[in-house]
Amino acid sequence: MIWTSSGGVGLLAACDVVVASEAARFCLSEARLGLVPATIGPYLVRAIGARAVRRYAVTAERFGAAEAHRLGLVHERCAPEALDAAVHAIVEAIAGNGPAAVRGCKRLAGELVGRPLTAELREETARLIADVRGGPEAREGMAAFLEGRAPSWR
C-alpha cells in the first residue's frame, strides 16, 4: 500500500497527469496536526472542487485510488504491477508531441480557467492558432504528417 498525504496530495493536484496504483491511498491529514491545507488549497480546489476539499480536509479521512479517480485527482489507475508501463506510455505520448505545442497547451489550459466564453476570448484564441500555425514547429509537424514521416522532434 502506498500512502500520499498532505503536501503530497497537493503536489498531485498541481500535476498535469496523474497515474496511481490501485493500492494507493490518499489523505489530507493537516487537520489531524492542527493545520490547514493552505498552501495546497488552491491546487486542490482546482483539481477536485471546493466541496470535496471541504469533506476530505475537515475529516482527514483516507480514500483510495477509485475515489481519487472519481474526484479527478487521478486521471488513470492501474494494477500495481502495471504502474511503470502506464506511466511510460503517457511519458512517450507527451514526448512525441511538439515541445512548443506542449508548452502552449499547458499555458492555454491555465489561462482559460474561469474565463467566460466572450468575443474577446474567441478573438484571442483565433489569433493564437493563427500565430502557432505559422511557426516552425507547426510547419514541420504538418509537413511530416502530409509526407507520412515522423516530425523532427521525435
Task: Tell where the protein language model's regions lie, with residue ranges.
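Short, structured loop/turn "capping" segments at alpha-beta junctions
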Residues: 50-55, 63-70, 97-103
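Helix-loop "lid/cap" segments that line or gate small-molecule binding pockets
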Residues: 56-57, 68, 108-113, 127-133
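A general structural signal for well-ordered alpha-helical segments in protein cores
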Residues: 41, 50-53, 84, 101-105, ...
